[in-house]
Amino acid sequence: MDSNEKLIKIIKKYRDAFQKKIEERKLEMECDNNEHYVIYNALGITDTEGYQIDLQQNVGRFLYKYAGSLLEELTISCFQSAFSDAKAKVKLANTIDKSPQNIEIDCLVENKAYEIKWKDATTDGDHVKKEHKRVQIIKDAGYIPVRLMFFEPNREQAIRIQSSLKKII
């Protein structure tokens, strides 16, 4: 199987899993208790609109998860095609504190530890602290951390956070 065929196979795998997850959630939602629609109604949202909002909120969560996982696997596959020594999902022990016990490098190529993000709009302070710790663990292990982000965030606060994360690498 050539590289293009391999990438297409990965895409199909994620597409099928994503579509299956949506269908499963639709079935689950048929049994949902929709008492919370009373609040939607109070805010001018009909039951039909409420269902669509709840469904799209679920689809959106799945979309972000599967989009990130898809792009990560495609990227790792490309690295492994280009670099015979590329290793995926390398775990390092947390040498700073007890939580988490390990951190994971998405793809390790020689001494470069790639973290692959399709889009990262996280804006909380806890995220920044975890990222500082992760980068320090990687550096302490003798690797160079590289953050590979395919799409930059759009919101001002997220842009500021991402800018601060770029400075620690």
Language-model segment annotations:
Residues 1-83:
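Interdomain/boundary linker segments immediately adjacent to catalytic/signaling cores
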Residues 1-3, 112, 147:
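Contiguous, function-dense segments enriched for cysteine-driven chemistry
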Residues 66, 70, 74, 102, ...:
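Short, well-structured alpha-helical interface segments that form or flank functional binding sites
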Residues 79, 105-118:
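Conserved catalytic cores of phosphodiester-cleaving nucleases, focusing on short active-site segments
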Residues 80-86, 140-142:
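Secondary-structure boundary elements
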Residues 84, 112, 136:
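Residue-level marker of positions within ordered structural domains that often coincide
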Residues 88-108:
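Active-site metal-binding core of divalent-cation-utilizing nuclease and nuclease-like domains
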Residues 118-168:
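Catalytic cores of nucleic-acid endonucleases
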